[in-house]
């Protein structure tokens, strides 16, 4: 956590090796979630609107991340700020999640094609 960031992890969650969770605002993870190796979760991003100011001096924008109960997040997944992942969802290895997923979603990346469907 950084600054006033809040992290809540539910019961019976498993995190494999090298997972990273960085909260400047809030990250909430439900019960019975499984995370593969090297999963990254960020609730913030660097600001970069002022081209005359170094990016590292422009601060951050942040928005809560929520992962509901019984989700399986595969290895090397990146979850970005503001995302809400509905319960019983599966995210396949190597996917970058940048928008909300409804409950019972399955998300996989096949080369350059991203497929989202109901479970």
Language-model-detected regions and their locations in the chain:
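Flexible, glycine/small-residue-enriched loop-and-beta-strand segment within the central core
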Residues: 1-83, 110-119
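Acidic, glycine-centered active-site loop in nucleotide-sugar glycosyltransferases
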Residues: 102-103, 108-111
């Amino acid at each position: 956590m950084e600054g006033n960031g809040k992290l809540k992890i539910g019961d019976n969650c498993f995190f494999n090796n090298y997972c990273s969770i960085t909260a400047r605002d809030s990250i909430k993870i439900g019960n019975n979630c499984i995370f593969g190796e090297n999963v990254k979760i960020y609730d913030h991003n660097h600001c970069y609107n002022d081209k005359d100011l170094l990016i590292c001096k422009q601060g951050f924008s942040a928005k809560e991340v929520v992962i509901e109960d019984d989700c399986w997040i595969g290895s090397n997944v990146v979850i970005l700020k503001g995302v809400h992942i509905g319960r019983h969802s599966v995210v396949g290895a190597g996917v970058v999640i940048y928008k909300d997923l409804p409950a019972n979603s399955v998300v996989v990346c096949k080369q350059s094609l991203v497929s989202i469907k109901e479970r």
